[in-house]
């Protein structure tokens, strides 16, 4: 099973991705926004990707 990171999860596109994730159980989704993960902080992103074994990143920010 692939792990997918969705950034900007509280925006319009991020919310639509949440709806799609609810019906697609083929993947494991991680939803974040700037409060949980600042995508401008490269080290924080790399740590998150490593810690959660992320396969795909979708930037909705």
Q: Which residues make up each language-model segment?
A:
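Conserved Rossmann-fold cofactor-binding substructure of NAD(P)-dependent oxidoreductases
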Residues: 37-58
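Structural signature of beta-strand start/N-cap positions in the alpha/beta core
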Residues: 3, 28, 53-55
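Conserved NAD(P)H cofactor-binding loop of Rossmann-fold oxidoreductase domains
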Residues: 61
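N-terminal Rossmann NAD(P)H-binding glycine-rich loop of SDR-like oxidoreductase domains
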Residues: 2-24
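Short, glycine- and charge-enriched coil/turn segments that flank and shape catalytic ligand pockets
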Residues: 24-28, 43
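A short beta-strand-loop structural module common to alpha/beta enzyme folds
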Residues: 28-39
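Generic anion/oxyanion-binding catalytic loop in active/binding sites
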Residues: 2, 34, 46
């Amino acid at each position: 099973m692939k792990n997918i990171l969705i950034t900007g999860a509280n925006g319009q596109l991020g919310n639509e991705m949440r709806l799609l994730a609810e019906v697609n159980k083929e993947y494991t989704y991680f939803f974040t926004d700037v409060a949980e993960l600042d995508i401008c902080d490269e080290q924080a992103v790399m740590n998150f990707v490593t810690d959660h074994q992320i396969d795909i990143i979708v930037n909705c920010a």
